[in-house]
Amino acid sequence: MPRVFLVRSRRPQPPNWSHLPDQLRGDAYVPDCSSLAVPPAHRSSGLRDTWAVSSQGTLTSAPKGPGTLGCPLCPKAFPLQRMLTRHLKCHSPARRHVCHYCGKGFHDAFDLKRHMRTHTGIRPFRCGACGKAFTQRCSLEAHLAKVHGQPASYAYRERREKLHVCEDCGFTSSRPDAYAQHRTLHRTT
């Protein structure tokens, strides 16, 4: 089987989603609740609140603790807006990011990128103690705790070290200078 590598490249033009209905097009679909009754106490409070649709079809304030954002479609709550936005994609039937090897669809580009590692064999998270490599950071952290008895104490930059992959032969390097030097070998041959 030929080796295949995930390479970032620009599309000739952005995809056109105009043929899809609105609820399938947006990053996060929140249904139009303008026809539902908003409780009078919340109309003029000036507070931004999170709403959920009750079984009777009326808006109710979603359960949340201090500093959390509730999903308007299910009981889950999140501490950050970006986490809520990502979660809202799971309620949409549209899966824009499709694996061209197996056809599996994903709501998020990051999930597709992580999935592609199963096809490419790229394992960017390496254990410093034994050298074993993993496709996901959480797998490395679990390995460190279970096998080496180390709690995960990596700095963000160490965890997210970029792996440079040659699309021609599969050469990998974490150092951009080594990757650039390798690429010159392909240009000379």
UniProtKB/Swiss-Prot annotation:
Does the record carry Zinc-finger as a key word?
yes
Q: Which Pfam families match?
A: zf-H2C2_2 (PF13465)
Keywords, A to Z, come to: Metal-binding, Nucleus, Repeat, Zinc, Zinc-finger
Tell me where in or outside the cell this protein is found. Nucleus
Question: Which residue ranges does the record annotate as region Disordered?
Answer: 1-20
Q: Which SMART domains match?
A: ZnF_C2H2 (SM00355)
One of the record's GO molecular function terms:
zinc ion binding
Chief subcellular location equals nucleus
The organism's place on the tree of life at top rank: Eukaryota
Q: What GO cellular component term, any one, is given?
A: nucleus
Q: What does this protein do?
A: May act as a transcription regulator.
* Family of this protein: Belongs to the krueppel C2H2-type zinc-finger protein family.
Task: Provide the protein name.
Answer: Putative transcription factor ovo-like protein 3
